[in-house]
Amino acid sequence: MKLFFRYVNSRVWSQAGSSHFNKALAKGPKTTTWIWSLHADAHDFQQSSSESTAASVGAKVFSSGLAHFSIVFFWLGGMHFHGAYFSNYSAWLKDPKTPGSQLVWSLVGQDILNQDLGGYFQSIRVTSGFFQLWRAEGIVTQVHLKYAAAAALIGSIATLWAAYFHMHISWSSSLRTMGSLSSYNAGQLAILAGLGSISWAGHQIHIALPINRLLDSGVDPSQLPSPQDLLFKDLMQVIFPGFGVGPAVDFSIYLNQKGAASEVGLNPSTGSIYLGQIASHHFFVGITCIISGIIALLVKRSKAGSFQDAAAFNNSWHSRLSINLAIAGSLSITFAHHIYAMPVYPFCGSDYATVLSLFVHHMWIGGFFIVGAGAHASIFMIRDEGVPAGIPSAKGRLYSVNSIIQQLLAHRDIIMGHLIYVTIALGMHAFGIYIHNDTLQALGRPEDIFSDNSIQLKPLFAVWVQSLPSLFLLNTLSGDAAVTGIPGFGLEVLDGKVVTMTQELGTADFMVHHIHAFTIHCTLLILMKGVLYSRSSRLVSDKLELGFRYPCDGPGRGGTCQISPWDHVFLGVFWMYNSLSIVIFHFFWKMQSDVWGVYDVSTQKIVHLTGGDFSVNSITINGWLRNFLWSQAAEVIQSYGSGLSGYGLIFLGAHFTWAFSLMFLWSGRGYWQELIESILWAHHKLKIVPNIQPRALSITQGRAVGLVHYMLGGIGTTWAFFLARVVALSIS
């Protein structure tokens, strides 16, 4: 108990502590350089800590993970708290069209942001997808949301305390466990993930599925049974006739109910995949993970060939993190495309603002994760891997001659040469087609441009891939059912709004997809170059001694700068931004043009939001500027004085933030040196000398500041532009 109160006080919590930072950081802020060093090194437990044993680093990694969980719990608690006290969730369950849970208080007129969402409720329109998620979970009252908010808050406090406890208080046995990466065995984690997936399937089957079945049949949410009532067999037999015979029979009843795994297509009541399919998915994913984990634990890997890398990967935090980030990022991007192709949440597919927000959000997450994978792969190559030909490295590890890493480094020039060739070929041809179209259209020769009405470029391979699901089901379904029964094929309408439909692919899609290929390959080129040449290059053979980040390589080498692995990550983020900007722009315009819209029953025609203009106008660069960026920015530019004015202010402020970044990205260190010295001279002249001495930004620090503001400004601008447009269209 005495040990507990020794550490639970504000003095210890606010103290930097020599065991958590190196000597320079532990001294506190003497100059402004300390601030930048803190940003750069606070989470670099291997380098910034005075105690950097494997055990202490493991404890800090574990603690930071718990702290992250605390933030996630706090965020979830906030979402559920707002849903419980400030939302129209109960009304939304009866008429699921315009969710809102962010009531703005009037201080100097901010209440103009509260839009009329129906049912005498005014709020900001939310597009997070939480209402649809809660409905899928089986939450039907705002009291349930209060319970969830309280549970999330308890979880946040518990994980925050656990993070602090593991960071400051430790035992030798636990440190040894955390220092060993075998504690985070992939097989064990797979089994845990499988158990979690099956647990979630159990919740869906026993709670969510019965409640959603009653909601779909028109039962008022206030008349629904409580979740604990569903644990009794009598009520379940009313909802699912024949229930209660035995586990095997019960499971088959769930699967054979309308809307379970034997059905294809979307639930006509909700415009989403049947919940029974989703429960089956989680159940079988869980089984697969458990079997895979058991196999991974039982099978002893061979020591020959590629598995000689096992020691390097198993003993490196950065290699594990790099692989996990790449996988998680790829899964996030995959989920982004599932949101519109196969909507899994009730009433989400017809809520265009939510679909757009979730797509863009998960695309950005995936992009940043993948760039992070490149960053930590570079750090792994520098800190955790040895040198070629079996020579011991400074870290004391050996490099296997026949390993995958050795093979990659031996062939890195060939790999990069091919990547460079592919990138240049894609870029020249893809942009060349656009420039050709702009030029000939400007010269009044529309018959000579690439378009569906003149010189066609048909995406034959894409159309074939698009048809594969329907071809796969031809053996089980007959006639049109093979096509219309699959989400994304045929037409799915909910309350007069198009949820999914077949996308016509033509010349415009062929052109923009090659731009996607170019930008993705360019991003990969930069990140791969940073990884493969992180230890040495032709100009700088001793990169390994310079570390992960350094501004230039020193005198006598021709002034080669921007060659560090950090600089490759820096440039990779920009190209990732380019890649994803084109992806989300393409998605937003394509969906407005060819998918989203209103189905007119009398004429049996779809009135799309932009009238199918994508194939006509997106084949020129001028069309992207005129018909997409300028034309569709009308809502955000003209938002002042309306409920969308908040997006107008964000649009303006984010532009300023983006422009501010250019001052850091286009100026050298000399500019900052002169500026700081001038300001210092003025302060000394006036005898106003700060305690924390100003220092000019280094080259790397300036680039980092510019990068952060560029990303914040660009993403903020895009966010305001998209949401102002889609919310205005949704409400109107």
UniProtKB/Swiss-Prot annotation:
Q: Transmembrane region positions?
A: 61-84, 145-168, 185-209, 278-296, 317-340, 356-382, 414-436, 510-528, 568-589, 644-666, 704-724
Bilayer topology annotation? Multi-pass membrane protein
Compartment list: Plastid, Chloroplast thylakoid membrane
Name the positions where chlorophyll a binds: 663, 671
Q: Where does phylloquinone bind?
A: 672
Would I find Plastid among this entry's keywords? yes
Q: What does the entry list as the binding residues for chlorophyll a'?
A: 655
Name the catalysed reactions.
reduced [plastocyanin] + hnu + oxidized [2Fe-2S]-[ferredoxin] = oxidized [plastocyanin] + reduced [2Fe-2S]-[ferredoxin]
Report any one BP term from Gene Ontology.
photosynthesis
Q: Which InterPro entries match?
A: PSI_PsaA, PSI_PsaA/B, PSI_PsaA/B_CS, PSI_PsaA/B_sf
Q: Where does [4Fe-4S] cluster bind?
A: 552, 561
Oligomeric state and interaction partners are given as: The PsaA/B heterodimer binds the P700 chlorophyll special pair and subsequent electron acceptors. PSI consists of a core antenna complex that captures photons, and an electron transfer chain that converts photonic excitation into a charge separation. The eukaryotic PSI reaction center is composed of at least 11 subunits.
Protein name (Swiss-Prot/TrEMBL): Photosystem I P700 chlorophyll a apoprotein A1
Organism of origin? Heterocapsa triquetra (Dinoflagellate)
Report the gene name. Answer: psaA
